[in-house]
Protein backbone atom coordinates (compact mmCIF):
# COMPACT_ATOMS: atom_id res chain seq x y z
CA UNK A 1 0.00 0.00 0.00
CA UNK A 2 2.98 2.33 0.26
CA UNK A 3 4.15 2.10 -3.37
CA UNK A 4 1.83 3.72 -5.94
CA UNK A 5 0.54 1.64 -8.87
CA UNK A 6 2.40 4.00 -11.21
CA UNK A 7 5.38 6.23 -10.58
CA UNK A 8 6.35 8.86 -13.15
CA UNK A 9 4.35 6.93 -15.73
CA UNK A 10 6.03 3.59 -14.99
CA UNK A 11 3.98 0.65 -13.68
CA UNK A 12 5.15 -0.63 -10.30
CA UNK A 13 4.63 -4.04 -8.76
CA UNK A 14 5.82 -5.13 -5.34
CA UNK A 15 6.17 -8.85 -4.74
CA UNK A 16 6.58 -10.05 -1.15
CA UNK A 17 9.43 -12.53 -0.80
CA UNK A 18 10.85 -14.76 1.88
CA UNK A 19 13.67 -12.79 3.50
CA UNK A 20 14.75 -15.59 5.84
CA UNK A 21 17.37 -16.76 3.36
CA UNK A 22 19.34 -13.55 3.73
CA UNK A 23 19.85 -14.29 7.40
CA UNK A 24 21.69 -17.56 6.70
CA UNK A 25 24.98 -16.00 5.56
CA UNK A 26 27.82 -18.31 6.72
CA UNK A 27 30.21 -15.34 6.69
CA UNK A 28 29.64 -12.90 9.57
CA UNK A 29 30.02 -9.16 8.92
CA UNK A 30 33.33 -9.17 10.82
CA UNK A 31 34.80 -11.52 8.21
CA UNK A 32 33.72 -9.29 5.34
CA UNK A 33 35.01 -6.18 7.15
CA UNK A 34 38.54 -7.42 7.79
CA UNK A 35 41.57 -6.97 5.54
CA UNK A 36 41.82 -9.58 2.76
CA UNK A 37 44.77 -10.59 0.60
CA UNK A 38 42.64 -10.73 -2.55
CA UNK A 39 39.80 -8.57 -3.81
CA UNK A 40 36.61 -10.62 -3.89
CA UNK A 41 33.00 -9.62 -4.25
CA UNK A 42 31.34 -9.33 -0.87
CA UNK A 43 34.18 -7.69 1.08
CA UNK A 44 34.39 -4.20 2.55
CA UNK A 45 35.82 -1.49 0.30
CA UNK A 46 35.36 2.25 -0.17
CA UNK A 47 36.66 5.59 -1.37
CA UNK A 48 39.03 7.00 1.25
CA UNK A 49 36.48 9.75 2.10
CA UNK A 50 33.50 7.37 2.43
CA UNK A 51 32.62 5.08 5.34
CA UNK A 52 32.41 1.58 3.83
CA UNK A 53 30.57 -0.40 1.19
CA UNK A 54 30.68 -3.72 -0.60
CA UNK A 55 32.78 -4.76 -3.57
CA UNK A 56 30.18 -5.95 -6.07
CA UNK A 57 32.14 -7.76 -8.77
CA UNK A 58 35.34 -8.19 -10.74
CA UNK A 59 34.77 -6.90 -14.28
CA UNK A 60 36.74 -6.25 -17.47
CA UNK A 61 36.70 -3.46 -20.03
CA UNK A 62 34.52 -4.40 -23.01
CA UNK A 63 35.59 -5.16 -26.57
CA UNK A 64 35.86 -2.14 -28.81
CA UNK A 65 36.94 0.24 -26.05
CA UNK A 66 40.52 1.37 -25.40
CA UNK A 67 40.45 -0.45 -22.03
CA UNK A 68 39.21 -3.76 -23.47
CA UNK A 69 40.27 -6.61 -21.19
CA UNK A 70 41.47 -4.33 -18.38
CA UNK A 71 40.50 -5.69 -14.97
CA UNK A 72 38.43 -3.49 -12.66
CA UNK A 73 36.42 -3.75 -9.49
CA UNK A 74 32.79 -2.63 -9.60
CA UNK A 75 30.68 -1.16 -6.82
CA UNK A 76 28.09 1.54 -6.27
CA UNK A 77 28.97 5.07 -7.28
CA UNK A 78 28.54 6.31 -3.71
CA UNK A 79 30.94 3.62 -2.43
CA UNK A 80 33.84 4.15 -4.86
CA UNK A 81 33.47 7.78 -5.91
CA UNK A 82 32.12 9.87 -3.04
CA UNK A 83 30.33 11.79 -5.79
CA UNK A 84 27.34 12.53 -3.58
CA UNK A 85 29.34 14.86 -1.34
CA UNK A 86 27.93 18.37 -1.13
CA UNK A 87 31.45 19.67 -0.44
CA UNK A 88 33.07 20.25 -3.83
CA UNK A 89 36.61 19.61 -2.56
CA UNK A 90 35.53 16.18 -1.24
CA UNK A 91 34.09 15.00 -4.55
CA UNK A 92 35.92 12.24 -6.31
CA UNK A 93 38.29 12.41 -9.23
CA UNK A 94 39.93 9.70 -11.28
CA UNK A 95 42.90 8.21 -9.46
CA UNK A 96 41.45 8.68 -5.96
CA UNK A 97 42.35 6.09 -3.32
CA UNK A 98 40.05 3.13 -2.69
CA UNK A 99 40.79 1.24 0.53
CA UNK A 100 40.16 -2.34 1.61
CA UNK A 101 38.56 -2.58 4.04
CA UNK A 102 36.59 0.65 3.82
CA UNK A 103 37.76 3.43 6.20
CA UNK A 104 34.96 2.87 8.75
CA UNK A 105 35.73 -0.84 8.90
CA UNK A 106 39.46 -0.13 9.29
CA UNK A 107 38.57 1.84 12.43
CA UNK A 108 35.90 -0.58 13.68
CA UNK A 109 37.67 -3.90 13.02
CA UNK A 110 41.39 -3.06 12.87
CA UNK A 111 41.18 -0.28 15.49
CA UNK A 112 43.38 2.19 13.62
CA UNK A 113 43.26 4.82 10.91
CA UNK A 114 43.86 4.39 7.18
CA UNK A 115 47.47 3.49 6.31
CA UNK A 116 49.26 3.38 2.93
CA UNK A 117 49.06 -0.43 2.74
CA UNK A 118 45.24 -0.18 2.83
CA UNK A 119 45.29 1.09 -0.77
CA UNK A 120 43.43 -1.50 -2.84
CA UNK A 121 42.52 0.35 -6.05
CA UNK A 122 42.40 3.69 -7.83
CA UNK A 123 39.13 5.19 -9.02
CA UNK A 124 38.94 4.76 -12.80
CA UNK A 125 35.48 5.87 -13.96
CA UNK A 126 32.17 7.01 -12.54
CA UNK A 127 29.18 9.11 -13.48
CA UNK A 128 28.83 12.04 -11.05
CA UNK A 129 25.44 12.49 -9.43
CA UNK A 130 23.56 15.51 -10.73
CA UNK A 131 20.82 16.75 -8.38
CA UNK A 132 19.12 18.62 -11.22
CA UNK A 133 18.15 15.46 -13.13
CA UNK A 134 17.32 11.79 -12.49
CA UNK A 135 20.43 9.67 -12.00
CA UNK A 136 20.15 6.44 -13.94
CA UNK A 137 23.47 4.89 -12.93
CA UNK A 138 24.80 4.07 -9.47
CA UNK A 139 28.04 2.38 -10.44
CA UNK A 140 31.74 3.09 -10.52
CA UNK A 141 34.86 1.11 -11.41
CA UNK A 142 38.36 1.19 -9.99
CA UNK A 143 41.69 -0.30 -11.08
CA UNK A 144 43.15 -2.75 -8.53
CA UNK A 145 46.62 -1.88 -7.26
CA UNK A 146 48.55 -4.10 -4.83
CA UNK A 147 45.88 -6.72 -4.19
CA UNK A 148 45.19 -9.61 -6.54
CA UNK A 149 41.76 -9.55 -8.15
CA UNK A 150 39.82 -12.75 -7.59
CA UNK A 151 36.68 -13.52 -9.59
CA UNK A 152 35.18 -15.36 -6.63
CA UNK A 153 32.34 -14.08 -4.50
CA UNK A 154 32.43 -14.69 -0.76
CA UNK A 155 29.65 -17.08 0.20
CA UNK A 156 29.32 -18.71 -3.23
CA UNK A 157 30.77 -22.13 -3.97
CA UNK A 158 31.29 -21.49 -7.67
CA UNK A 159 32.39 -18.56 -9.79
CA UNK A 160 29.71 -17.34 -12.16
CA UNK A 161 30.67 -15.40 -15.24
CA UNK A 162 28.36 -12.94 -16.95
CA UNK A 163 27.14 -14.50 -20.17
CA UNK A 164 24.78 -11.78 -21.30
CA UNK A 165 22.05 -9.39 -20.29
CA UNK A 166 18.37 -10.26 -19.83
CA UNK A 167 15.23 -8.60 -18.54
CA UNK A 168 14.32 -9.58 -14.97
CA UNK A 169 11.45 -11.96 -14.35
CA UNK A 170 9.15 -12.28 -11.34
CA UNK A 171 10.36 -15.27 -9.35
CA UNK A 172 13.84 -15.15 -10.84
CA UNK A 173 16.50 -16.31 -8.36
CA UNK A 174 19.10 -13.66 -7.51
CA UNK A 175 21.90 -13.73 -4.97
CA UNK A 176 23.90 -11.04 -3.22
CA UNK A 177 27.00 -11.27 -1.10
CA UNK A 178 27.74 -8.59 1.47
What does each of the following model-derived ranges do?
Residues 1-31:
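Autoinhibitory propeptides
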Residues 29-178:
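Serine endopeptidase catalytic core focused on the charge-relay Asp
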